[in-house]
Design a protein with these regions (language model features):
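PLD/PLD-like phosphodiesterase catalytic module centered on the HKD motif
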Residues: 2-93, 97, 115-209, 213, ...
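Extended catalytic-interface subdomain
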Residues: 184-191, 204, 210-211, 240-290
Length: 440
């Protein structure tokens, strides 16, 4: 029994019978960095009929994960792995144009010149008047250039203008931890350190693509990421619920004669964050915890035993008064398998910056570990202007420190490179993930 872990923040945790290890560099997970408190969110997943067919170590993992996150049972054919950014983009457009009832997209931002994608969304809305479009992006990133230049917000505002906010619901999440004088003096390229909307959820009807890719040109052409297409109504509903919950804690884009403005709807589930941060965090905790706990099953069960269990786990640290995020407990539980001799770990990260608890599990474990990271020439910040240009070397330094601490032939680090980023035929690397194989 192999273990596969990917994240779109929120992310699913897979337990799968068999998956091809050659696809590891397509797998991804985002790790929350820094020290913080967390508490598990317990759920009732019911009995798994083929529980005893799993590896004994896997059974122990299933029991613990069942106390953290809802479990979704999938069978062969319910998951399609997309390997190339062009395939991801073409698949997304194809799904959108065939939509029958809903399109829901969560991303950090949409590239400000992605006119083709906006036209595809518009065509789908024109073609089928029953479709509802929901978009969730980060407010700071999506209005960075406004009002003096084009931005994500100005790009997608015409969809609201044409189809109305009852059909096109565009939400912009604003971190509760940056407002007032602090926001006015913080450079726009640095304000992300206070928090942002980083989910990448691309759902159409009863299918959902989970990825680490934003909706912009490099992610559609020459930035290697990971893309998982889930053909599951229940899982799609779950992620639609996640997006809906965060949207209810976000601003709504409203069009005006001057372009657009951000409004806080009266039916939102919290007051504006800058008015009372503590109250906002209490409200957002009340809204999000049930979403993490709840699983609504609508699909008809079959006699076929599932070969893959999916546990969606999430990081909502900035929105919890007492952090109830589920991703770190899940990752650490999986990494406890490294204590068994004969276990294997493959990990990949575009940016080498390992959480201290994860690093501790790797260094003290008995497993053979292989880590794939971006070479400096595959780092999107390579030769960029300003302080960000120092980041590739900083990640190399972090990697060297890690290797000095490891001091073991059981830990191997590989650098991914395909040409030189920002030059002809050069790619960047953005995949992040974990794959643990238990012994036996």
């Amino acid at each position: 029994m192999d273990f596969l872990k990917i994240q779109t923040n929120p992310l699913p945790f897979f337990l799968a019978e068999s998956l091809n290890p050659d696809s590891m560099n397509r797998i991804a997970a985002f790790f929350a960095h820094g020290k913080r408190r967390f508490s598990s969110v317990k759920v009732d997943n019911g009995t798994l009929e083929n529980y005893h067919s799993f590896n004994p170590l896997v059974r122990g993992t299933i029991q613990q994960l069942d106390s953290i996150a809802p479990r979704f049972a999938l069978k062969k054919g319910d998951i399609e792995i997309l390997n190339h950014p062009v395939t991801f983009y073409e698949t997304l457009k194809e799904k959108i144009l065939k939509a029958e009832k809903r399109i829901f997209l969560s991303s950090l931002y949409i590239g400000k010149h992605e006119d083709e994608l906006v036209k595809v969304l518009d065509d789908a809305l024109v073609k089928n008047p029953n479709i509802k479009l929901d978009i969730l992006v980060d407010a700071l990133r999506s209005t960075r250039e406004a009002p003096h230049s084009d931005s994500t917000a100005s790009l997608i505002a015409p969809l609201v203008e044409k189809h109305g906010k009852h059909r096109v619901n565009i939400r912009l999440y604003h971190t509760p931890h940056l407002h007032g004088w602090r926001e006015s003096i913080t450079p726009k390229r640095l304000n992300e350190i206070y928090g942002l909307q980083h989910m990448k959820i691309y759902g159409v009807d009863d299918e959902v693509i989970l990825s680490g890719a934003n909706l912009s040109r490099d992610y559609f052409t020459n930035r290697q990421d990971r893309y998982y297409l889930f053909k599951s109504k229940d899982l799609s509903n779950y992620y639609h619920g996640i997006q809906t919950a965060v949207s209810s804690l976000s601003y709504q884009l409203i069009t005006s004669s001057r372009g657009f403005f951000l409004d806080w709807p009266t039916d939102n589930n919290a007051s504006e964050p800058h008015l009372n941060v503590e109250r906002f965090l209490s409200d957002s905790t009340r809204v999000l915890v049930p979403v993490l706990r709840t699983k609504k099953v609508e699909t008809t069960t079959t006699n076929e035993d599932p070969d893959t269990l999916v546990y969606p786990v999430s990081s909502f640290a900035p929105l919890f008064k007492d952090d109830k995020s589920t991703e770190l407990p899940c990752v650490l539980r999986m990494l406890s398998l490294l204590d068994h001799k004969g276990a294997k770990l493959t990990m990949t990260a575009g940016y080498f910056n390992i959480h201290p608890k994860i690093k501790e599990r790797i260094l003290r474990g008995q497993a053979c570990s292989e880590i794939i990271t971006a070479s400096p020439e595959a780092n999107s910040f390579y030769l960029s202007k300003g302080i960000s240009g120092l980041l590739p070397d900083a990640y190399v330094y972090s990697c060297e420190k890690f290797m000095n601490e490891a001091n073991s032939s059981a830990v191997k680090v590989l650098e991914w490179q395909n040409g030189v980023v920002n030059t002809p035929n050069g790619w960047s690397y953005h995949a992040k993930g974990l794959w643990v194989t238990p012994p036996g």
